[in-house]
């Protein structure tokens, strides 16, 4: 397996699972966490390593260290492994997904932004979903026909129990306290704004070529997806909130190893599902428009990354993230995109506009 994003939450969990099944790791890539990368190198002995910045190269305990995006693409080309787990955060992961598709590799995709911004250019790629909701949908949809509607669930994020009027005052520390999941900073903020759920709906549309998709809040994160059939029947996928299950579905050839303790239905508290309030989560207003106009993905994602970065750096408030997105959409409208190069152009233009 080739693992990009090895020091993040998904990468660390993937390596625990790889150790469980003795899956050889041929390549590791990370951003700046060189100390953890060196521990991973010592344990998994990859043939190739990549880091973001050449200034850290001398710190890496390996004799084949590649640098930046060029280095990632070199690894994909040179390494014969058929499986890439792409756990790079954000738009930065897109070029690796495109290269892996070009090379015919199986892509265990944790980088949902690839599909959000460029789904129409990734048709035909061999994707294995790593998000828990999409792994759940894959399980529910296998061999099924006559589907009326799909649902994925949201926990509500760090501010589910907050009143709308209190969201003006929330701090970064508050926003990073996810009630159910242990994740990286960016996705934890995206969960709090509901941008993550918006992106997951578009991801599901591209993965399963189906537009009747919605999301509901299920605060305990025990139900991950539901499938409604035309005859009125519905199925649901239950599991505890732990990313290892979805990762194992993507990287293991057989799903015969105990990964989590099953949900004990006899002890399970009452489940409640709630619609997502677009007053509290204004970004979610974009769901239907986005499904109608998937080209909006590059604008929404770039603006969201700028807004989240500013919030993480204490340069703006929590509510400014949504304002950032709507400001960019007002300016650019629906982009006409006919090539992958235009995706990169619109990403650049959106960031430049919001920084000016």
UniProtKB/Swiss-Prot annotation:
The protein's matches in Pfam families, at most eight in alphabetical order, are given as: DXP_redisom_C, DXP_reductoisom, DXPR_C
One Gene Ontology BP term is:
isopentenyl diphosphate biosynthetic process, methylerythritol 4-phosphate pathway involved in terpenoid biosynthetic process
Q: What enzyme class is recorded for this protein? A: oxidoreductase
Q: Catalysed reaction per UniProt?
A: 2-C-methyl-D-erythritol 4-phosphate + NADP(+) = 1-deoxy-D-xylulose 5-phosphate + NADPH + H(+)
Query: Domain of life of the organism in this record?
Result: Bacteria
Any one Gene Ontology MF annotation carried by this entry is: 1-deoxy-D-xylulose-5-phosphate reductoisomerase activity
EC annotation from Swiss-Prot or TrEMBL: 1.1.1.267
Residues annotated as binding Mn(2+) are: 131, 133, 200
| Cofactor(s), by name | Mg(2+); Mn(2+)
Residue positions annotated to bind NADPH are: 7-10, 31, 33, 111, 113, 184
Key words of the record: Isoprene biosynthesis, Manganese, Metal-binding, NADP, Oxidoreductase
Q: In which pathway does it act?
A: Isoprenoid biosynthesis; isopentenyl diphosphate biosynthesis via DXP pathway; isopentenyl diphosphate from 1-deoxy-D-xylulose 5-phosphate: step 1/6
Q: Which residues bind 1-deoxy-D-xylulose 5-phosphate?
A: 112, 132-133, 155, 178, 191, 196-197, 200
- Similarity remark: Belongs to the DXR family.
Q: What is known about what this protein does?
A: Catalyzes the NADPH-dependent rearrangement and reduction of 1-deoxy-D-xylulose-5-phosphate (DXP) to 2-C-methyl-D-erythritol 4-phosphate (MEP).
HAMAP family, alphabetically?
A: DXP_reductoisom
Know the name of this protein? 1-deoxy-D-xylulose 5-phosphate reductoisomerase
Q: Which organism is it from?
A: Campylobacter jejuni (strain RM1221)
Lineage at the top is: Bacteria, Pseudomonadati, Campylobacterota, Epsilonproteobacteria, Campylobacterales
Q: Write the gene name.
A: dxr
């Amino acid at each position: 397996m080739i693992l990009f994003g090895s020091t993040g939450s998904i990468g660390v969990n993937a390596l625990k699972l790889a150790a469980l099944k003795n899956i050889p790791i041929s390549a590791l890539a990370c951003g700046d966490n060189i100390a953890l990368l060196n521990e991973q190198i010592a344990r998994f002995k990859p043939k190739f390593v990549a880091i973001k910045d050449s200034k850290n190269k001398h710190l890496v305990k390996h004799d084949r260290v590649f640098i930046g995006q060029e280095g990632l693409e070199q690894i994909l080309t040179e390494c014969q492994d058929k499986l890439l787990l792409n756990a790079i955060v954000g738009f930065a992961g897109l070029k690796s997904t495109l290269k892996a598709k070009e090379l015919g590799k199986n892509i265990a995709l944790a980088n949902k932004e690839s599909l959000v911004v460029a789904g129409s250019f990734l048709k035909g790629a061999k994707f294995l979903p790593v998000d828990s909701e999409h792994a759940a949908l894959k399980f529910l949809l296998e061999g099924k026909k006559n589907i009326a509607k799909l649902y994925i669930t949201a926990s509500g994020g760090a501010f589910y129990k907050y009143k709308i009027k209190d969201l003006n005052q929330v701090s970064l520390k508050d926003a990073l306290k996810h009630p159910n999941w242990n994740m990286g900073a960016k996705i934890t903020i995206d969960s709090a704004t509901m941008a993550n759920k918006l992106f997951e709906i578009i991801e599901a549309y591209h993965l399963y070529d189906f537009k009747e998709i919605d999301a509901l809040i299920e605060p305990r994160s025990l139900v991950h997806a539901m499938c409604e059939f035309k005859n009125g029947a519905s199925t649901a996928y239950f599991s505890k909130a732990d990313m290892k299950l979805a990762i194992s579905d993507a990287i293991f050839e057989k799903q015969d190893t105990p990964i989590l303790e099953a949900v004990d239905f006899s002890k399970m508290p009452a489940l409640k599902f709630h619609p997502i309030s677009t007053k509290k989560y204004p970004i979610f207003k974009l769901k239907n428009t986005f499904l109608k106009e998937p080209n909006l993905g590059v604008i929404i994602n770039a603006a969201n990354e700028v807004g989240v970065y500013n919030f993480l750096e204490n340069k703006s408030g929590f509510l400014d993230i949504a304002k950032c997105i709507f400001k960019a959409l007002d300016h650019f409208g629906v982009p006409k995109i006919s090539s992958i190069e235009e995706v990169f152009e619109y990403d650049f233009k959106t960031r430049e506009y919001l920084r000016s």
